[in-house]
Amino acid sequence: MLPWTVIGLALSLRLARSGAERGLPASALQGDLLFLLDSSASVSHYEFNRVREFLGRLAALLPVGPGALRASLVHVGSRPHTEFPFGQHSSGSAVQDAIRAAAQRMGDTNTGLALAYAKKQLFAKAAGARPGVPKVLVWVTDGGSSDPVGPPMQELKDLGVTVFIVSTGRGNLLELSAAASAPAEKHLHFVDVDDLHIITQALRGSILDAMWPQQLHASEVTSSGFRLAWPSLLTADSGYYVLELAPSTDPGAARRQQLPGNATGWAWTGLDSDTDYDVALVPESNVRLLRSQHLRVRTLPEETGPELIVVSHTRPRSLRVSWAPALGPDAALGYHVQVGPLRGGAAQSVEVPAGENSTTLQGLAPGTAYLVTVTAAFRSGRERALSAKACTPEGERSRAPRPQPQRTGGREP
C-alpha cells in the first residue's frame, strides 16, 4: 500500500507545482468540490475524527470563494445527508470549521446510494452547483460498502466528474482503481488514518489541477477535420509537444504528431465524418512539468447535395438551372455551374454564391444538347457534383410571305 501513496504523492506534488508555473492565480480557478465522507457505523469514532480533521485542513488550503471554488460535504450512511451545500461558506477556513463541526451519522455504509445522491447535488442549482464549471468528488472511505459502487461512480465519471479516492482501510485495490478517475496512481491513495497528513498537499495540488481551466480547444470543425489551438506553454528552446488523436471507439488507431515548443495550433484532416475523436496535447519539457490536456471532438455528418437538378425556361440561347441545395451542418461555400455541348465544344461556367440555388445560363446555341453540372464546394475542402442533360429548342423559322389578295372586276394592263 505504501508504494501507491508515495507514487501518488510524488506525481501530485509535481502537478501542484506546475499549476503555479502556468502564471494564473489560484483565484482564477472555478469548480464545485464535493467531499463524500464515510460517516457510517463501520468507521470508528477515532477514525472519523481523524478523517474529519484531514478534510478540514485540506479545505483550508483551497481557494474557496463565491467566484472561485465552492465546496459541499455529504455523509455516507443508511441515507445520504448533506452537511452543507455549495456556496454556503465563502472561505477555506469557514469550510474547515463546518467540517470540524460535522457529527458522525452512523448507520449502514450505502455508498452507492450516496453517489447517486452526489450526482444530483453536483449538477443541481438548488444545491448551489454551477453549470459549466469543473466538478470534483473526493471520497474518503475505509474501503467497504453495503451496496454496489461501480455503476453510480461510472455515471459520475461519464458526466465529466473527476473522482479522487482516499482509502484508510483494506479496500479492494482493483475495485477502487476502477472507481477512481484514471490514472489510478494520481487519483487513488491508500494511507493509514494516522498518516493522512502526508497526502494533504499532494491531494490539494491534484484538485487544483483538475479544476484548471481547459486551454485546449477545437474550431473550424467539418465532416473531415478540425483545427486545434492552445495558449503558448513552451518555447522553441524549452521543449516540444506531442499531439495524439484517436477515434474514441478505437484507441489503437491513434495518430501522433510532434510539434515544436513555439507551436500554438494544428489542423487534423482526412478524418471520418460523424465520429468522436479523443485528442491529447502532451507538453514535453526538461525545464518544468506541464500536465497533458484532453479534449473530445465530434466531426460533422458527411455533406449531401446538390440534388435534383431541374431545367426550366428553355430558350434557343438560354435556359434556367435550379437544384436542391446542399444540406448538413457543414454548409456549402458556393456552387460552380458548368455547361458544355454533349457532342464537344467549349464549355462555360458560372459561380453561384451560397444561399442561392438557381442561375440562368446565357449564350447557348439553338437546337443543342448540353450537359449541365452543378458542383457544391464545402469548408472541408470536399466537393460534390451532380449532372443533368438539357436541350435548347431550335430557333424561330422565317415566316412565309403573306399572300396578297386577288383583285376582281378589273382589266389586266
From Swiss-Prot:
Q: Which domain of life is it from?
A: Eukaryota
Its predominant location is secreted
Domain named VWFA: residues = 32-211
BP GO terms, sorted: translation
Enumerate the InterPro entries for this protein. ECM_Assembly_Org, FN3_dom, FN3_sf, Ig-like_fold, Ribosomal_bS16_CS, VWF_A, vWFA_dom_sf
- Per the record, residues carrying Phosphoserine are S72, S78, S91
Q: Which residues form the signal peptide?
A: 1-20
Q: Where is this region: Disordered?
A: 385-413
Keywords (A to Z) from UniProt: Basement membrane, Disulfide bond, Extracellular matrix, Glycoprotein, Phosphoprotein, Repeat, Secreted, Signal
One GO cellular component assignment for this chain's record is: ribosome
Fibronectin type-III domain residues are 212-302, 305-395
Instruction: Give its localization.
Output: Secreted, Extracellular space, Extracellular matrix, Basement membrane
Any one GO MF term held by the record is: structural constituent of ribosome
The family database entries (PROSITE patterns) matched by this protein are listed as:
FN3, VWFA
Residues annotated as glycosylated: N262
Fill in the PTM field for this protein. Answer: N-glycosylated.
Q: How does it assemble?
A: Homodimer or homomultimer; disulfide-linked. Interacts with HSPG2.
Role of this protein: Promotes matrix assembly. Involved in the organization of skeletal muscles and in the formation of neuromuscular junctions.
This protein's name = von Willebrand factor A domain-containing protein 1
Name its species.
Bos taurus (Bovine)
As recorded in Swiss-Prot or TrEMBL, the protein's gene is named VWA1
